[in-house]
């Protein structure tokens, strides 16, 4: 059985993913609480950091700790993150944090770098096949604003 947990307490778009993820059999979608104050607390002072910067590291810590805690509380044997499929995410950081949280909570962490072996391209194909929503920013407001600025500058 697979559980998909939406852990990004700061995610701007949640409902669409939750509805679309219900497509798969044997997949349970667990929508974590929307608690943006947790994200804003760890992002304080890092608002101007670019994607892949220190703000992202702190966000990875927040997400993976919440995931590991949930896994422990609900009797899961292992946890991981799909964030490593993105070419914009630092898989080394994700895995280092995941291993640390595994040790802290006593739940195994599945090392991941899903973008390898054409994983990112395959994810795009699967998204098309299953008509899944794909956004072009990580989900936090700062990343969204950065992406909007990049798009605006490309039009000029």
Where on the chain are the PLM-derived regions?
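A short, N-terminal amphipathic alpha-helix
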Residues: 17-24
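Auxiliary Fe-S-binding modules of radical SAM enzymes
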Residues: 95-156
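Single conserved hydrophobic/aromatic residue that forms the stacking wall/gate
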Residues: 1-15
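Active-site adenylate/phosphate-handling loop in enzymes that bind or generate adenylated species
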Residues: 48-116
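Cofactor-cradling patches in redox/metallo enzymes
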Residues: 17, 37, 89-91, 95-97, ...
